[in-house]
Amino acid sequence: MFFDNNKILITGNGTFAQAMITQLLSYEEIKEVRVFSRNENKQWETSKRFNDRRLNMIIGDIRNYGALLSAIRGVDYVIHSGALKHVAVCERQPVEAIATNVIGSMNVMLASISTNVKKLVCLSTDKSANASTCYGATKYLMERLAIGPRPQGRSPPP
């Protein structure tokens, strides 16, 4: 299996993260699943729900590069799902949306590069296409950072 004997870190602890945790822990060969999220209550509930020694709940914020770097050290794969996701919240608090969805995502990318993770998967949204909201715009910028610069006239990889 793809994740055999590997350690995976998931940022965020929303609906997608819960589904990923369920799937990953179903593989007996998974070494460790780390969940890095700032929601203390959700972290506690998740640890009780799964009650699996391979699950490591880490309270932290992707906007804090040092804490994130510490959490990522030693993992093989990173699944980045941490974000402010409510359109109305991002509209009312654009600075927070930028700090989390753009700067925080950049921190995830930089920490993943500096610790030589095998693969980083960044989750986005359909709202980033022709973005008309602050949320959509921040996710579009996250996508651009993930793709990185490319020579003019070249298409991004498939």
Show which residues each predicted segment covers.
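Short, conserved SAM-binding/catalytic segment
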Residues: E45-R53
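Hydrophobic/small residue at the entry helix of a nucleotide-binding pocket
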Residues: F16-A17
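Helix N-cap at the beta1-alpha1 junction of Rossmann-like dinucleotide-binding domains, i.e.
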Residues: E40-N41
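Conserved Rossmann-fold NAD(P)-dependent oxidoreductase catalytic core, especially the SDR/UDP-sugar
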Residues: Y77-H80, L84-E143, G148, P157
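Conserved S-adenosyl-L-methionine
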Residues: L25-E32, N116
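Conserved N-terminal Rossmann-fold NAD(P)-binding element of oxidoreductases
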Residues: L9-G12
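Conserved residues in the N-terminal Rossmann fold of short-chain dehydrogenase/reductase
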Residues: S37, I58-I59, A99
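Conserved Rossmann-fold cofactor-binding substructure of NAD(P)-dependent oxidoreductases
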Residues: N56-Y77
